[in-house]
């Protein structure tokens, strides 16, 4: 078999297995499956809202599914692993099945669509689109869309980011298709950008030596000014002090003058005696 035909056959088998599991696990809240081929066989991971209903009592239902997959689709040693879908309101397959079930139970399509859209957005989805098509209220078919948030419709982001689910509601007037597309929270979109604050520079510790050197000239100037002020104050104090004058007698002579004259006369007398 050519390589191209082999890939086509594998894709066709995968689609048939997905359709079979969706039909068998409708009541368990089927949320999709992932099939991988390994050297030990075919590994199938089933996501469901109620994993206990997939396994069954004592593993009875999961063994039945394993036998049917091996016999009907000729899978090599199929091994089924059941996982919980997590937040069911963010799984497009689960939301589409709920919407189809609501329409089958008689809900008005606008009420059902708006209710599901609000639940999905309240769960934290970045965007959601619900498309309901078929005979909604009259004999003619029409399409109604309910949109909220951000949705990619084309390109690689639409294939990798957007989760798509489809379900059919069967009513008396005919079949109604329900398509749900959800952008989960945390999805990285190609046109997203983020502004980050610049990194903070580490605070530098002040250098003590420079501060000391800068402080020395100012201290020297203050010392000189203080010394000059002290000298000036001493000079002013000396100038302001009054000059003391000796007391005078009635004749206008100081009391020491007579003593000095007496000493002079005694010296003259002594000199005359020596001359003789």
Swiss-Prot record:
InterPro entries from the UniProt entry: KH_dom, KH_dom-like_a/b, KH_dom_type_2, KH_sf_prok-type, Ribosomal_S3_C_sf, Ribosomal_uS3_arc, Ribosomal_uS3_C, Ribosomal_uS3_euk/arc
Disordered: annotated span: 193-276
GO CC annotation terms, alphabetical: cytosolic small ribosomal subunit
BP terms from Gene Ontology: translation
Record's compositionally biased regions (Low complexity): 214-227
UniProt entry keywords in alphabetical sequence: Ribonucleoprotein, Ribosomal protein, RNA-binding, rRNA-binding
Listed name of the protein: Small ribosomal subunit protein uS3
Taxonomic placement: Archaea, Methanobacteriati, Methanobacteriota, Stenosarchaea group, Methanomicrobia
Name of the gene: rps3
